[in-house]
Swiss-Prot record:
This is Uroplakin-3b-like protein 1. Belongs to the uroplakin-3 family. It comes from Bos taurus (Bovine). Glycans are attached at residues 78, 130. GO terms for cellular component: membrane.
Length: 253
């Protein structure tokens, strides 16, 4: 009994250390780097989305089952070092946590959706940020990305007991940016400003003169043209010419 009492603190420490080591070793590393889709694919990069190749055949390890969830971790490039895999599904970060944490989980799937084997003719890609209707507080929501990045992603396998395996982080991905129209290079001199002002005034005077000319022409045309009313009548005098008059009868025969 005395021996057991003296060894109990040491035994508890060893068990705690063993549990920590087991948790640290349970996360299997998958030597796969997520890749962007082919450069020939339309919409590969937009202002709020990007497209990945599906990780086909990368989750065939015996420790991974068909019921395990495969998440895509989306992170700011400078937040990958502080990423911590959630221990429970309830602790999964959502897009609403992105500004504070710098990462979230989305596009939940299973390994049955990423089978191995030869590639087929079907287009198999993952479009990140493609769902505009889901709430950013919904677990697994695939909301449009909030800025140009850069972003990095990886796949995380989770079971009911916690995280099981993860892939490598991808390289940095930068989204397209809206082009902003810029003025001509170089400062505008005072002479340029004066010339622009004079041309603007001359254009206004020319338009005013043209408008006045049109109005004057319209009034002049309407005032000089006689317009007969519908009630005016035209009388034509009837007369006979002398050579058309009938000769009178002279005497009886």
């Amino acid at each position: 009994m005395g021996l057991g009492r003296g060894q109990s603190p040491l035994l508890m420490a060893l068990l705690l250390l063993l549990a920590c080591l087991q948790m640290g070793m349970s996360l299997e590393r998958i030597s796969y780097v997520p890749q962007l889709s082919s450069a020939t694919l339309a919409g590969r990069l937009t202002q709020s989305t990007f497209t990945l190749e599906q990780p086909r055949g990368q989750f065939s390890h015996p420790s991974i089952s068909d019921s395990d969830a495969i998440w895509l971790v989306v992170a700011h490039s400078n937040a990958t070092q502080k990423f911590t895999a959630p221990q429970k599904v309830e602790d999964t970060p959502v897009p609403a946590d992105f500004p504070q944490r710098g990462y979230y989980l989305t596009l939940r799937a299973s390994r049955a959706l990423y089978p191995g084997g030869p590639p087929s003719n079907q287009l198999r890609v993952l479009r990140v940020g493609n769902d505009t209707r889901c709430s950013p507080r919904t677990r697994g929501c695939n909301r449009p990305l909030p800025g140009p990045g850069p972003y990095r992603v990886k796949f995380l396998v989770m079971s009911d007991r916690g995280p099981m395996a993860e892939t490598e982080w991808s390289s940095e991905t930068r989204l397209q940016q809206a082009e902003v129209l810029q003025a001509a290079p170089g400062p505008q001199t005072a002479g340029t400003v004066v010339i622009i002002a004079i041309l603007s005034v001359l254009l206004a005077v020319l338009l005013a003169a043209l408008l006045a000319l049109l109005i004057f022409t319209w009034y002049d045309t309407c005032g000089s043209t006689p317009i007969s009313g519908p009630g005016e009548l035209v009388f034509v005098r009837k007369y006979d010419t002398h050579h058309m008059s009938r000769p009178s009868t002279v005497g009886g025969s």
